[in-house]
Amino acid sequence: MLMASTTSAVPGHPSLPSLPSNSSQERPLDTRDPLLARAELALLSIVFVAVALSNGLVLAALARRGRRGHWAPIHVFIGHLCLADLAVALFQVLPQLAWKATDRFRGPDALCRAVKYLQMVGMYASSYMILAMTLDRHRAICRPMLAYRHGSGAHWNRPVLVAWAFSLLLSLPQLFIFAQRNVEGGSGVTDCWACFAEPWGRRTYVTWIALMVFVAPTLGIAACQVLIFREIHASLVPGPSERPGGRRRGRRTGSPGEGAHVSAAVAKTVRMTLVIVVVYVLCWAPFFLVQLWAAWDPEAPLEGAPFVLLMLLASLNSCTNPWIYASFSSSVSSELRSLLCCARGRTPPSLGPQDESCTTASSSLAKDTSS
């Protein structure tokens, strides 16, 4: 799925990454467990519908808001995150679903390479768009003047472009690793398989993907969220000017009412930080753990149903992404309620300009954290 075909050189196993093409093991046709195959198809179908529907709804809500000219910088990132997750649904889950249904890849060599390339682009883009969004929040809150000079309100901005560019570039090895290859000796049966020049190539490549798609973005997201929390917490701590006998050198300003608003914003930021990091890790960790296990352990339980099904959960994070960010953006959640009310024939609630999201550099710290 990730860095190999859905078929394997392991006998009888239809879903694990393929071994180098010089493996002496071969899997004959029609050896799949029918119950497990149906479970795989059902799981992929559910994931595809969930990813496509959830991201489509959030994109529709953003489009409605954009027609009224109410796009804020955070909406740009949420929109591109939804596009990246839709790419996961269309170019990763859907081809995988068709592949599972036919057991072998049905298509020419160019299509095999293109599918494998686009599968990886979606995975990179989904992770890197979250990282870009987090970096933008860090810049807006911790370096507001820098964010104001550069601006971030366009539909395409620098972090978005960098995220897409890295996704496209880092996926290029897929074009050279995968190809339509004979998988059953001289029988003429072909499949979209990976081939590595050295025996250690597969382990190295799987580890590299795990680091670049999961470990590095996780560390970056966690670090930025910690810095954001520290910045907001520092704004609430009375400075020397607010202590008895102190001089006016503190950072905290504003009325008690504003301080209460910032306190509520801090609580919301803490919740958002925990949700983002925990959900990101929980969604990606099972998939990459079994991928690394399969790559590094020759005795890995490749035939077990839990192992097989976990191999299919690379797109799980794409199901949760739109709802996490929509729930923490009052403007997007209000627009979603309005969209659903219109679909049911109800009168939508009015949406005021105060629902704007949070990452403009000119916003107050409270607004930056309470989107």
From Swiss-Prot:
Residues 15-24 have a biased composition (Low complexity). Changing residue 247 to H: In a breast cancer sample; somatic mutation. A lipid is attached at residues 341-342 (S-palmitoyl cysteine). Its main location: membrane. Changing residue 137 to H: In NDI1; fails to activate the adenylyl cyclase system. GO terms for cellular component: clathrin-coated endocytic vesicle membrane; endocytic vesicle; endoplasmic reticulum; endosome; Golgi apparatus; membrane; perinuclear region of cytoplasm; plasma membrane. Kidney. Gene3D superfamilies: Rhodopsin 7-helix transmembrane proteins. Residues 1-38, 99-113, 181-200, 294-308 are extracellular. InterPro entries: GPCR_Rhodpsn (IPR000276), GPCR_Rhodpsn_7TM (IPR017452), Vasoprsn_rcpt (IPR001817), Vprsn_rcpt_V2 (IPR000161). Residues 1-30, 240-259, 349-371 are annotated as: Disordered. GO terms for biological process: activation of adenylate cyclase activity; adenylate cyclase-modulating G protein-coupled receptor signaling pathway; cellular response to hormone stimulus; G protein-coupled receptor signaling pathway; hemostasis; negative regulation of cell population proliferation; positive regulation of cell population proliferation; positive regulation of gene expression. Residues 64-77, 136-159, 221-271, 329-371 are cytoplasmic. It is found in: Cell membrane. Keywords: Cell membrane, Diabetes insipidus, Disease variant, G-protein coupled receptor, Glycoprotein, Lipoprotein, Membrane, Palmitate, Receptor, Transducer, Transmembrane, Transmembrane helix. It is a multi-pass membrane protein. Changing residue 137 to C: In NSIAD; constitutively active. The chain crosses the membrane at residues 39-63, 78-98, 114-135, 160-180, 201-220, 272-293, 309-328. One of its GO terms (molecular function) is vasopressin receptor activity. It comes from the Eukaryota. Glycans are attached at residue 22. It is linked to Nephrogenic syndrome of inappropriate antidiuresis: Characterized by an inability to excrete a free water load, with inappropriately concentrated urine and resultant hyponatremia, hypoosmolarity, and natriuresis. Diabetes insipidus, nephrogenic, 1, X-linked: A disorder caused by the inability of the renal collecting ducts to absorb water in response to arginine vasopressin. Characterized by excessive water drinking (polydipsia), excessive urine excretion (polyuria), persistent hypotonic urine, and hypokalemia. Receptor for arginine vasopressin. The activity of this receptor is mediated by G proteins which activate adenylate cyclase. Involved in renal water reabsorption. Interacts with ARRDC4. Identified in a complex containing at least ARRDC4, V2R and HGS. Interacts with TMEM147. Belongs to the G-protein coupled receptor 1 family. Vasopressin/oxytocin receptor subfamily. This is Vasopressin V2 receptor.
